[in-house]
């Protein structure tokens, strides 16, 4: 997190910060640290991925729901019942950090630009360390690691971002 203060300064007047990276790369930890410095609200894609096969759906939800210009929000995913949960309303005026696999995509960048200044960040970490972190956080992820990694791989070439870390 050597660059945290530099990035926080760049994000201070941003309406939207998008933080992407593969599972276990440190997105949630970085977002929390950045939010402490900027006061931005943090939205976690983990709260609304629709099941283990839902990466593409969640990516669309960022642009259409989370970054909606007048009625932003998202539908939580209930991981215990594998069903949609309650709707969460967001304040359209509040600056936010959106973090998770798939946060940076063409549609989310376009939607974020309509809100004002956007800063995009991608975190990198080697696969072995990422897997160890992810499974330490949630041992049940072991059964789904390959399914999720395949969706990450299928995203193909990544868009350029303002900051590449790792």
Residue ranges and their predicted role:
Residues 1-16:
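Extreme N-terminal, non-catalytic leader segments
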Residues 19:
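Hydrophobic anchor at the beta1->P-loop junction of P-loop NTPases
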Residues 22:
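P-loop (Walker A) phosphate-binding loop of NTP-binding proteins
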Residues 27:
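Conserved lysine of the Walker
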Residues 30:
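Hydrophobic positions on the alpha1 helix immediately C-terminal to the Walker A/P-loop
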Residues 41, 47-100:
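Conserved nucleotide-sensing/catalytic segment adjacent to the nucleotide-binding pocket
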Residues 87-137:
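ATP-dependent NMP and nucleoside kinases share a basic, alpha-helical "lid"
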Residues 136-166:
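Small-molecule kinase domains that catalyze NTP-dependent phosphoryl transfer to phosphate-bearing small molecules
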């Amino acid at each position: 997190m050597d660059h945290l203060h530099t990035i926080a300064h760049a994000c201070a007047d941003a309406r939207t910060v998008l933080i992407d990276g593969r599972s276990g790369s440190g997105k949630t930890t970085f977002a929390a640290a950045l939010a402490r410095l900027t006061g931005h609200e943090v939205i976690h894609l983990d709260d609304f991925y629709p099941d283990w096969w839902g990466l593409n759906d969640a990516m669309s939800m960022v642009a259409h729901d989370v970054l909606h210009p007048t009625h932003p929000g998202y539908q939580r995913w209930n991981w215990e019942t594998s069903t949609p949960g309650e709707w969460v309303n967001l304040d359209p005026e509040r600056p936010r950090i959106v973090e998770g696999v798939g946060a940076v995509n063409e549609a989310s960048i376009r939607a974020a630009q309509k809100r004002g200044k956007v800063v995009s960040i991608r975190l990198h970490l080697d696969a072995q360390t990422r897997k160890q972190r992810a499974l330490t956080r949630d041992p049940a992820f072991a059964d789904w690691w390959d399914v999720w990694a395949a969706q990450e791989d299928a995203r193909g070439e990544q868009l350029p971002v303002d900051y590449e870390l790792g």
